[in-house]
Amino acid sequence: MEQQTLSSVTIRPITAADDPFIAKIIRTNFEQYHLTIPGTAYFDPELDHLRAFYSAKPDRGYFVAVGENGTVLGCCGFAETAVFDRCAELQKLYLSAAAKVKRVGRRLSETVEQAARDAGYETLYIETHSKFDAAIRLYEKLGFQQIDKPQGVQHGAMDHFYLKSL
């Protein structure tokens, strides 16, 4: 996918150099919400090597939002899920404190939606936690519909589940 500049933020595919910055943003979010518990992405084995994980298969993608000075502001991706057919999971949408007021989450989500559609997926699935209330509001504004907890949930500590047709 080509780079896409939206105001002063560029959304682009992940590089290996982004890995430590993304891992720090993700861990910081879990620490701020006191969710450093098993059953969350905080303990995902690929967290320090997201570039390798998302580039391992052609129907995955991961994107970073970068400010004018090159600072990584946020991240979001998608990968296959066994929860539903022809469905990708929107994964690891996290923002730095500086990005939370710039609508970066919306921009990343929309980029991921288009990339998942381009990869042939028909639906996006999200699992999140009720403590991530700003993310829940964003998902609902983007048209995701809350569903009951499906079978095969990857992160057992999550308590909110959503679907959106692409």
Task: Please place each PLM-identified region on the residue numbering.
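Acetyl-CoA-dependent GNAT
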Residues: 4, 9, 13-91, 96-97, ...
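C-terminal "cap" of GNAT-fold acetyltransferases
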Residues: 32, 122-166
